[in-house]
Amino acid sequence: MFKLGTIGLLSLAVLLRIAFFLFGVYQDEHFTVKYTDIDYQVFNDAAWFVAHRKSPYNRDTYRYTPLLSWLLLPNHMIPWFHFGKLIFVLCDLATGVLILQMLKKLKSKYRYGTDRMTIMAAIWLLNPMVITISTRGNAESVLCFLILSFLYCFLCEQYLLGGLLFGLSIHFKIYPIIYALPIAIYVAAAHYNKTQSVFKSSFKLFLVGFSTLIVLILLTVFMYMLYGDKFIDQTYLYHIYRTDHRHNFSVWNMLLYFNSALPKTSELSKFVFLPQMIIVLAISLTQLRRPSSFPLLCNVLFLETFAFVTFNKVCTSQYFIWYLIFLPFVLYNTRISMRRGIVMLVVWVATQALWLRQGYLLEFEGQNVFYPGLFCASVGFFVSNAWILGQFIEDTIIQNDYVYRIEPSESRSKDSAVIDKPAIAKTEKAE
């Protein structure tokens, strides 16, 4: 059987991205429907304003940190419109390299085998959805790189640097703040398991929290001094009151559509955060009931992100890679059978396809399919994602209650988890 080594995997990943990138440039020049994401045009225009000593928020619909517009300044200095895409592709590849490095680190710490590392890393590096999103000029790959960077620092017990990067990732896009509680539990419990003093354990937790807050405060104050209230409103507050109902998979899609016709004083869209936050908090707290380990942290972050995206009032295709970065770690020791995994994948793809069909009829054919077509498609996608989330929650419980056990050997640290072969056999028989 052909085995693709690390070098081969990375080489193939680079070649695929080059091919997608070049095809995108060709399509933009020769086809009516453009390959480049419309958001990339927004980033590019905002960078143009910055290059001319103006605010990036002079560009309508720019609702991101100014750092993103600064990142694309070379577009207007070289000048080359597509240069920013190369930055996003490099972040995409760097994320894949981090996945490989983290799996290698886990190999020594948690006795991970080498046979599945390449396969797990390929989930990101060879994923056509991931490649398409970065080569089209979507900036999510930058955020994914930041998230895995601070997780890698925590894995290596570099808590100061990890906290700084965590703060930067929250500034870049606010949703990673939901990771604060699981990270706090992991840092505190990991050192408690190592029988360190309460002072040392508390100091590590303080170090992470302090460094995170320092970065957030400094960046927020600095950007506010440069761009004023527009920065706060467009970067953060907008995502609370936004009512986007186009290109939106969310089950709240129809609610937002009708809400957009109501007076601006309507508070309706703010309440859709409530079920989302309750579920995310509940998932975070389940970590308290189990021994702390880095694999468990990755599982919890995956579940949090999956639930956050599923219940979010705005859900687009690029949001999916928010949880795809954790999938290699979740699937490494999954107890989900191959058959069930295929069913989950088919359901996830099929319900997306049904929604995209309705979206095509609406956007390109001009048909009024908001109800029942688009509404039913959104409900179907939501229900399928809720079922898939339940499967992964069950899998996480099985992994940590049966698959992992704390090794009593004095030769290894007490937080090191190993595969419990008898437990695996027992669960397989039970299934």
From Swiss-Prot:
Pfam entry (one): Mannosyl_trans
Keyword Transmembrane assigned: yes
InterPro entries linked: PIG-M (IPR007704)
Chain segments annotated as transmembrane: 5-25, 80-100, 117-137, 142-162, 165-185, 205-225, 268-288, 291-311, 314-334, 342-362, 369-389
GO MF: alpha-1,4-mannosyltransferase activity; glycolipid mannosyltransferase activity
EC number(s) per entry: 2.4.1.-
Topology in the lipid bilayer: Multi-pass membrane protein
BP-aspect Gene Ontology terms: fungal-type cell wall organization; GPI anchor biosynthetic process
Pathway: Glycolipid biosynthesis; glycosylphosphatidylinositol-anchor biosynthesis
Tagged with keyword Nucleotide-binding: no
Subcellular localization, as worded in the UniProt entry: Endoplasmic reticulum membrane
Keywords linked to the UniProt accession: Cell wall biogenesis/degradation, Endoplasmic reticulum, Glycosyltransferase, GPI-anchor biosynthesis, Membrane, Transferase, Transmembrane, Transmembrane helix
GO CC terms of this entry: endoplasmic reticulum membrane; glycosylphosphatidylinositol-mannosyltransferase I complex
Residues covered by region (Disordered): 410-431
Major site of localization recorded for this protein: endoplasmic reticulum
Entry similarity comment: Belongs to the PIGM family.
Task of the protein: Mannosyltransferase involved in glycosylphosphatidylinositol-anchor biosynthesis. Transfers the first alpha-1,4-mannose to GlcN-acyl-PI during GPI precursor assembly. Required for cell wall integrity.
Name of this chain's protein: GPI mannosyltransferase 1
Origin organism lineage: Eukaryota, Fungi, Dikarya, Ascomycota, Saccharomycotina
